[in-house]
């Protein structure tokens, strides 16, 4: 592949940190918003700080990076923004209310921003993975994971490689495809 990728460490939920990171990189033509954390538990037990941490990392970070990347894309009249959402952004999940809200916000951001940027030939889409075999899902017990897998018609969790492959496909998708929330969930939801 003829792709240049860079990685930086910063607090994605803090605009000043994201702005500092953007000052160190060339303006991106393709932006993949993939920052994500979860909180598992009852909303009534969740602290205000935890709520803000989840929303800042999952939703505000996508706003910050998009805000900083868009001027270059508009100037070039070309760009792709791919937001990583979740099936919980489509249907919500008990015990993961903040995560569901943040991913629902990602879906709304994707749809609205796609309409705003389409005249500039910038496509904005989201991928909504289901249960993917990542560290974030391994906070669940083996019993809970097995129970969820029983509900998935594909009878397994997805892999990070499958998500990456779909991201690559969306990057290379036709310019007429914008504002889409694409589920990758093994037929689960």
PLM-predicted stretches and their roles:
Residues 1-28, 39, 49:
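Short-chain dehydrogenase/reductase
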Residues 78, 156-184:
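C-terminal substrate-recognition "lid" of short-chain dehydrogenase/reductases
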Residues 118, 123, 177-179:
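Short, small/polar-rich loop/turn modules that mediate ligand/substrate recognition or access, typified
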Residues 71, 115-119:
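Alpha-helical segment proximal to the catalytic Tyr-Lys
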Residues 86:
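Residue(s) in the substrate-gating loop at a strand-loop-helix junction
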